[in-house]
Amino acid sequence: MSNHFYIEHPSFTSDCSTLVIRSQRVPARAAPWDLYACDADGLNLRQLTDEDDANNFALAHEGSLAWYQRGTTLWSVDVGTGERREVCGGPPDVLPMGYWCGCASPDGKFYFGYGRRRSDDQGVVIRYRTDGTEAVVLAADPHLCHLHASPGGHGISFGGVNERGEGVQYGMNHDGTNLRVLPTATLSHFTWAGTTKRFVGAGMWERRVIHTIEEGQRDSSVVVEGSFFWHTGISWDAEWTVADTNWPNEGLMIVNIRARQYARLCLTDNTAGHPQWTHAHPAFSPDGRRAVYTSDRTGMCQVYVADVPEEFKAWVATPNPDAAPGGRLPEWRPE
């Protein structure tokens, strides 16, 4: 079973030359995950890790390092050379906690990972200095999930519950200060909007929209509507969104936020069921020229890359009288 990193995290190296994925050795709940890399065109596949306890992978925003936890110890691996290195031990009285991905600050100074507090088994956010000098607990929550570092350096976000037991998304600074509830309750599968302070996501339940919101706003701004958008990856300049769809599954949609128009890029043929590995979870390469997604179209989840032609993007970004209400364009026909 193989998949790329989630919509919130980079799966390509900063120079866009290399794709990094994770692969489970056998399809079993407790089976180990290994990290692999290949060229952006799918060639030169190589294995980067083979430890049974590796988890919570994160790719650096700049350079060629990937970070991961073994238990509560931080490790790094060079995507180019395969060199692995133990970086920093974990904080005391914290147990391991495995999740999909960790995350790294865009300047590369910090890695944020998961653990569980020994005293009450609550999930904790661990911040490691990547120079190996410190590992500290920043926050705790009984339902900790979805650690995500803002590509613009505006802090990190994570999922949890409030005092009433309701699911919420929190934000805080890299040092753990300014813990607050983010205004993302109406956004499904949200992410930071590139390097900006805004957030972008699909509509909740019956709302067939992609919309954005910023801290301090009461209401979100609808970008496009019409398809049942599901997960939204976004370009670092926050001009483009790539979204998968469901009910029905219409494939990947490319959205230009400025023009408020969208069109289908490709079909994904994933089953889009309850298991996470049946979801496409699309994301862009840093240059926006490729979209990476996961599909179980063969019966087992694998990673796919779709080129996003510049001509196609120019067409989507140009106001078009043929766009339907809500911004959907007809199928693209390259000349």
Over which residues does each language-model region extend?
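Blade-loop segments of beta-propeller domains
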Residues: 2-9, 23-68
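A flexible loop/linker signature enriched in serine peptidases of the S9 family
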Residues: 4, 23-33, 70-75, 92-96, ...
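Repeated scaffold domains used in trafficking and secretory/extracellular systems
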Residues: 7-9, 53-58, 96-103, 143-148, ...
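Hydrophobic beta-strand positions that form the internal "hydrophobic ladder"
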Residues: 19, 65-66, 110-111, 155-156, ...
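Asp-box/WD-like beta-propeller blade repeats and closely related beta-sheet repeat scaffolds
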Residues: 47-118
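Conserved blade-ending motifs and adjacent loop-strand segments that build the rim/top face
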Residues: 186-188, 223-233, 260-284, 320-328
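Loop/turn-rich, solvent-exposed surfaces of beta-rich toroidal or solenoidal domains
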Residues: 206-208, 222-261
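Blade-level signature of beta-propeller repeat domains, shared across WD40, Kelch, NHL, RCC1
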Residues: 278-335
